[in-house]
A protein has these predicted regions:
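Short secondary-structure transition hinges
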Residues: 21, 25-62, 73, 82-84, ...
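Secondary-structure edge/capping motif, primarily at the C-terminal ends of alpha-helices
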Residues: 1-5, 31-38, 98-105
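Hydrophobic alpha-helical connector segments
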Residues: 1-30, 80-87
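C-terminal peripheral helix-coil segments that are non-catalytic and often amphipathic
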Residues: 22, 55, 59, 63-71, ...
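Short alpha-helical transmembrane interface motifs in multi-pass membrane proteins
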Residues: 14, 47-51, 126-127
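Gram-positive cell-envelope targeting signals
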Residues: 13, 31-34, 46, 85, ...
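Short, hydrophobic secondary-structure boundary micro-motifs
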Residues: 32-34, 47, 77, 107, ...
Length: 145
């Protein structure tokens, strides 16, 4: 979806948010495993893991935002690499909030005890989408979608 040139950056971001929430429910064990693998103290694994697991995604997010800047969709003053990193951190935090106990508790404390239930997914997606649109997209473009 990130490489789909028929979609606007706003549409791609919304699709990615939906995927983050859906995959957190469907692949909870994998999300937890990723969290465990990325937070252990094994130095060799720490240096290999981000490169092997994150490079593919990082390159696509940066490309998506840079192309969006060229098309006038993404704020031109942003560093696309730092913006991609920040956007991915939001996606990652959402995934952990649904799959990992500590992050779920934080999610609930900031919101309410049932925020991680499926009935609230649209609210979570919509609100997070508004935050990302405001941070990343040119105002006229973010109002379009």
């Amino acid at each position: 979806m990130v490489d789909d040139e028929t979609l606007s950056v706003a549409q791609k971001i919304e699709c990615l948010l939906r995927l983050a929430v859906k995959s957190s429910r469907e692949e909870m064990t994998l999300i937890r495993l990723y969290h465990e693998m990325s937070s252990i103290g094994n130095q060799n694994l720490m240096y290999k893991l981000p490169r092997s697991m994150e490079l593919f995604t990082a390159e696509r997010y940066v490309k998506m935002l840079e192309e969006g800047q060229k098309k006038g969709e993404v704020r031109p003053e942003l560093d696309a690499r730092l913006a991609a990193f920040s956007m991915d951190n939001i996606f990652l935090s959402l995934q952990f909030a649904y799959a990992c106990d500590y992050y779920r508790i934080r999610f609930q404390l900031y919101n309410h005890p049932e925020i991680d239930k499926e009935e609230y997914d649209e609210k979570v997606i919509s609100e997070t989408f508004q935050i990302l649109k405001g941070a990343l997209l040119v105002p006229d473009m973010s109002e379009r979608d």
